[in-house]
Every structure is written in C-alpha cells, then in structure tokens.
Amino acid sequence: MQLATRSLFIVRVVALSLGVAALCVALTRPQAAEQHHHTVVPADAVKWGPAPPSLPPGAQAAALLGSPAKEGPFVLRLKFPAGFTIPPHRHSKDEYVTVIAGAFAIASGEKVDRASLEPLPPGSFVHLPAGMPHYAVTDVETIVQINGVGPFDVTYVDPKDDPRKR
C-alpha cells in the first residue's frame, strides 16, 4: 500500500509542477506578442489638425503615436506659423523635442528674453527636464516633433498666458 501512496504522491507533484510551468508560459506569451508590433507613418500620411488647447491659437498638431492626454508614450508633431511664441511654461514630465523643418528658437527661464533664445535648425534636438520653465519662438513656419510620456501637462508661469483660460 505504501508504494501506491508514494506513486500517487509523485504523480501529483509532477502534475502540479507541469501545471505551474504551463501557467507561467501562458502568462508570458501574450505580453511578448504585444511588444512585437511597430507603427509606420509615411510623411504624406501625417494628418494635421488643431493643436492641443494648451498651445496658443495658430498651431497645428498631428499625433503619430499615442496621446499626450493618456497614460503611456506619445509622439506628437507640432506645426507653428512664422512669428509664433510659446510663453514660458513647464511640464511635470521630461519633454524631448526634435526640429523637423523651419527654425525653432528656445530658452529656459520664466520671462521671454529674445537675446537668450538658442536657434535650432532642422535636425536639432533638445531635452527639457521636468519642472524647468522654458519658452520658444519661431520666425518662419516650423515643425517640431515632441516625444514624451503621458499624461503630459503644460503649466504656464504666468496664468494669464494660458490659452485655456481665455
């Protein structure tokens, strides 16, 4: 009788081990499969629309991936007309900006000082750390690409500059 009990115990241990192993495999496979896709947006497929209301009027936006308003990574293109100014503001998360076309001039600080602006031609990149006040100006039509992680906020240094409050 002891041999039968011992054999039954071994069978149960092996079955339980196989069940746990199968569960581990089942739980990891869907996650790995979800990570294996990509997003392609050809230049001629970029769809421009209104910019987020946190930007002054006149800007246009095209969401290439995700949404700045939602949890997770996003890629957003912004198109600014010549003579556009983004007043001093900050974000609670890092911002990564690449100049695609035109000329983007940017500086850090709580007041616009044109002498402090650093002109960035196409191909330039700037990292803006969370909490750092900054502002930007365009003298010609300009397109930039913003990469970040949402939800992404904009807080103007001077609340009177916030277009959402007008």
Feature locations, PLM:
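Glycine- and acidic-residue-biased ligand/ion/polar-headgroup-sensing regions
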Residues: 81-84, 91-111
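Short beta-strand His + acidic residue motifs that chelate non-heme Fe in jelly-roll/DSBH
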Residues: 86-88, 106-107, 128, 133-139
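N-terminal secretory signal peptides that target proteins for export/translocation
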Residues: 1-10
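Double-stranded beta-helix
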Residues: 37-39, 115-118, 135-166
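Short acidic-glycine-tyrosine-enriched beta hairpin
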Residues: 110-130
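A short, N-terminal "cap"/entry segment at the start of jelly-roll beta-barrel domains
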Residues: 30-74, 159-166
